[in-house]
């Protein structure tokens, strides 16, 4: 199993001067938490897409990666949509095993990541059912026990709704489906988000 962490973006809302993944909570950064959690749960390879002030993030990666498990992927066009970061990591999709896709700026309990990794379901995601609705959250709409819609702007016809945590688990086939859909969308819109590709695939009922 491999994990891809998207950490190239600028923290506009948080107004931080460093990459968001370097935020320290207590005595550890988000980066350190991701690294320790993923390795302890059996992930063999970690890809991290870097962009904004990447020199600081790369320095920190080299300091913590004693086991040489991290592949650094550079996205010089980090000011564009997150879909560019995902496509920048195209070669990482060929690494062996299922793919865990993660937003780098999430603070979480290790138990929820374990639940995602341990599930027998091939293609799945984590949601938070307790959230404040609005324009910003990426919403997951469930209807008849299936994901009906996904994105910031969604159809209102659903049984219940949650917010995407930004953590996904994809089989190898589904991961390449996501990559290919992302490439198609990026040709016409480099400001798109990777969630747009997931939404398109869900709408086409291809997975999840």
Label every PLM stretch briefly.
Residues 7, 50, 103, 127-128:
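Short beta-strand/turn micro-motifs composed of small residues
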């Amino acid at each position: 199993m491999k994990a891809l962490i998207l950490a190239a973006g600028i923290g506009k809302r948080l107004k931080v001067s460093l990459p968001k993944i370097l935020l320290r909570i207590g005595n550890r950064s988000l980066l350190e938490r991701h690294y320790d959690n993923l390795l302890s749960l059996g992930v063999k390879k970690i890809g991290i897409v870097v962009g904004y002030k990447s020199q600081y993030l790369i320095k920190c990666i080299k300091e913590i990666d004693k086991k040489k498990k991290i592949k650094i992927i550079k996205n010089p066009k980090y000011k564009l949509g997150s879909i560019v970061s995902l496509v920048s990591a195209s070669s990482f999709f060929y690494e062996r095993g299922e793919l865990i896709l993660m937003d780098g700026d999430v603070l979480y309990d290790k138990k929820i990541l374990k639940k995602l990794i341990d599930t027998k379901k091939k293609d799945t995601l984590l949601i938070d059912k307790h959230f404040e609705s609005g324009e910003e959250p990426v919403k997951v709409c469930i209807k008849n026990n299936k994901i009906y819609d996904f994105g910031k702007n969604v159809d209102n016809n659903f049984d219940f709704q949650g917010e995407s945590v930004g953590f996904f688990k994809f089989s190898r086939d589904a991961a390449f489906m996501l990559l290919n859909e992302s490439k198609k969308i990026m040709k016409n819109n480099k400001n798109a988000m990777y969630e747009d590709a997931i939404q398109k695939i869900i709408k086409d009922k291809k997975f999840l």
